[in-house]
Amino acid sequence: MNKHQKPVLTGQRFKTRKRDEKEKFEPTVFRDTLVQGLNEAGDDLEAVAKFLDSTGSRLDYRRYADTLFDILVAGSMLAPGGTRIDDGDKTKMTNHCVFSANEDHETIRNYAQVFNKLIRRYKYLEKAFEDEMKKLLLFLKAFSEAEQTKLAMLSGILLGNGTLPATILTSLFTDSLVKEGIAASFAVKLFKAWMAEKDANSVTSSLRKANLDKRLLELFPVNRQSVDHFAKYFTDAGLKELSDFLRVQQSLGTRKELQKELQERLSQECPIKEVVLYVKEEMKRNDLPETAVIGLLWTCIMNAVEWNKKEELVAEQALKHLKQYAPLLAVFSSQGQSELVLLQKVQEYCYDNIHFMKAFQKIVVLFYKADVLSEEAILKWYKEAHAAKGKSVFLDQMKKFVEWLQNAEEESESEGEES
């Protein structure tokens, strides 16, 4: 069947839809209305909030969200890169914006409230505002130092009250910002403002949720991406909590790697001497304390075996396995605190793995005989340093052995007095 050309109406004028007709002029109309309203409200931020609330029904905030936020922050529409589009025409700009505000926490916090109210009223602006802040952080080079400081304070306060997610910080990892030192400098100001709103635990928790806790070193150029450099920079800036947090994160990462490598070596049944040398090198290289290492060793040793599910057989299996690795544990339990950590680890393991409940005392006695644990450590654990998990069961198991230790100690003391 042949396709016939559709007839065309001649002499008919098609009316342009009203929306399409004025779209061309809307950005400037939007800007002019916003600038005029902000200038009329002046420094009265309550009046600004009311103006923005009521004007949302007349202006298309959804379509021109970037213009809205550009003007509220910078006082003008911004071109790509961050330069002011209307820099030469003061009638198209306003001085009643974040960048023109006083550089103090309370003033910027009041501006943050304007954004909070606006986004609560027009929920659809939430994502647009997040995108705007990511964009503004990319434009930092175009802003003056004072403007950068105010933007950092605003960002920190909004992160603190939950208006913004920590993911906006990914913009700071841009090469140009990092190389020129802008990223680190901005981050310090931002974190100070954030911590003025929330405690350090809340801040670090947000960083973890956004998977940024492991990326903080990226605020610095590659040749300065060390924990020591980060710690000094942030501690000197009065943010020791962040320095400590990063050290802990790095230490946890190091421990995970060490545990993985140890697990591999134990599964390959490497000679104990080799394992000792490897662990000592890692301790020195990563500044790891013995108390951390002894816990890792215990975990790795216990993970190296498929344990029997029968309670009456597992104790014998455990003693045979632990006797083999007692010399390894002995090397890294040379301090009283390390011995207590090991005792608590054994206690927790036996409590968490029910088949081991009755094996606790036998394991402790084995370690005592193998010079892994001293009587001083065992007595201290018994009297005051035991964990809460299953303590009544384990203290009862240990009662006779502890009495024997105490009697032996008394006998040796009396023999010393006689001689």
Swiss-Prot record:
Localization of this protein: Cytoplasm
GO biological process, one term: regulation of translational initiation
GO CC aspect terms: cytoplasm; membrane
Keywords linked to the UniProt accession: Acetylation, Cytoplasm, Phosphoprotein, Translation regulation
Entry keyword Oxidoreductase: no
Domain of life: Eukaryota
Domain W2: 248-415
UniProt feature coiled coil, ranges: none
InterPro entries: ARM-type_fold (IPR016024), eIF5-mimic_regulator (IPR051245), W2_BZW1/2 (IPR043510), W2_domain (IPR003307)
Function: Translation initiation regulator which represses non-AUG initiated translation and repeat-associated non-AUG (RAN) initiated translation by acting as a competitive inhibitor of eukaryotic translation initiation factor 5 (EIF5) function. Increases the accuracy of translation initiation by impeding EIF5-dependent translation from non-AUG codons by competing with it for interaction with EIF2S2 within the 43S pre-initiation complex (PIC) in an EIF3C-binding dependent manner.
Subunit and partners: Interacts with EIF3E, EIF2S2 and EIF3C.
Protein name (database record): eIF5-mimic protein 1
Organismal lineage: Eukaryota, Metazoa, Chordata, Craniata, Vertebrata
